[in-house]
């Protein structure tokens, strides 16, 4: 869903 994608992008940014 939209929220899942948003969290995925945020998590990826933190992980980078």
Curated annotation (Swiss-Prot):
Q: Which residues carry this modification: Serine amide?
A: 16
On whether Protein biosynthesis is a keyword of this UniProt record, the answer is no
Q: Which UniProt keywords apply?
A: Amidation, Amphibian defense peptide, Antibiotic, Antimicrobial, Immunity, Innate immunity
One BP annotation, GO:
innate immune response
The answer to whether keyword Signal applies is: no
Q: Give the family this protein belongs to, as stated in its UniProt record.
A: Belongs to the frog skin active peptide (FSAP) family. Frenatin subfamily.
General function of this protein: Antimicrobial peptide with potent activity against Gram-negative bacteria. In vitro, is cytotoxic to non-small cell lung adenocarcinoma A549 cells. Also, stimulates production of some pro-inflammatory cytokines (IL-1beta, and IL-23, but not TNF-alpha) by mouse peritoneal macrophages and down-regulates production of the anti-inflammatory cytokine IL-10 by lipopolysaccharide (LPS)-stimulated cells. Very weakly stimulates insulin release. Has a very weak activity in hemolysis.
Q: What is the protein named?
A: Frenatin 2.2S
The protein's organism comes out as Sphaenorhynchus lacteus
